Amino acid sequence: MARTLGKTLSSQELDFYRDSGYLIRDRLLGPDKFEALGEHFEGKLASLSPEERPEDMDVPHFTDPELFRWLFDEDVLDLVAQIIGPDIALFSSHFFCKPPRDGKSVPWHQDAYYWRETINPSTEAITIWLAIDPSTRENGCMRVIPGSHLTREARYRDVTRAGSVFDEELDAAQVDESRAVPVELLPGQASIHAAGLVHGSEANLSSSRRCGFTMRYISTEVRFNHEGLGHKHQIYLARGVDRAGNVYADPTRSYPEVIGNRGRGQSYLGTRRPGA
């Protein structure tokens, strides 16, 4: 598993990402920035109502502009630019937290499948998964199938078991679990993965919490379906210039109406039904 510490990715690391669809970074933010993010997250987690699941803290930046301190962090964007180019839009973010002995499982899936009505092409996005807590095999760390982002054909089926974050999953015949690699992270470490990479995670049956912050980016050459879905989602120009005629939201504003239009929990936008 390739790991990188410095700001600049080597040609070997970039080749690994292109071939495998993921990469591990030993440090994403400086210590002070990471500590501040952790404190900010703990405040948000503590404010959840009893009926709100900690896995469902999706798109928190729509109503919390302070999060752009980290989403637009120059070190983060420097890293993103090496993978998708200099013109960058923030696509989404998500605090994903699995409480001990209770966290839901995430079935095998490709992010691009759920975004196919939102961005075009939906495969041209990357996700940074920043560990707030240790993410281990015991508490349900992410597992990936290296190289699976290079295969475009995919069949999905309904999830019938309880306790799943999503309501659809890849057909089991399409996933060779013997090739799965656990992505274990210490606090402050981060993984980067392509939108087409097959990945998932088990429920957290351990006594330790597993929380992380996902930051999702696209090149501004990717087209966002603002006409059809602008009432449920927004993107933000993070660096550079627009290349696709996209409409961008204001990072200094709050958009509670967008949250209201999405509904509670994991919303897939478009014509898809919401997940569990």
Kindly label every feature range from the protein language model.
Residues L29-P31, F96-K98, Y113, S135-R137, ...:
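Short, solvent-exposed loop/turn segments at secondary-structure junctions
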Residues G30, P65-F72, P121, E177-L186, ...:
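Aromatic-acidic/polar surface patches that form glycan- and anion
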Residues Q110-D111, V165-E177, R209, G228-Q234:
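Short, surface-exposed loop/helix-turn segments at secondary-structure junctions
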Residues A2, L45-S47, G196-A276:
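Non-heme Fe(II)/2-oxoglutarate
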Residues M1-I119, R157, G228, L237-V241:
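Non-heme Fe(II)-dependent double-stranded beta-helix
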Residues H109, T118-R137, E184-L186, I192, ...:
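Short, conserved beta-strand element in jelly-roll/cupin
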Residues P86-S93, K104-V106, E124-L130, G140, ...:
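Generic beta-strand structural signal
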Residues S135-E202:
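Double-stranded beta-helix
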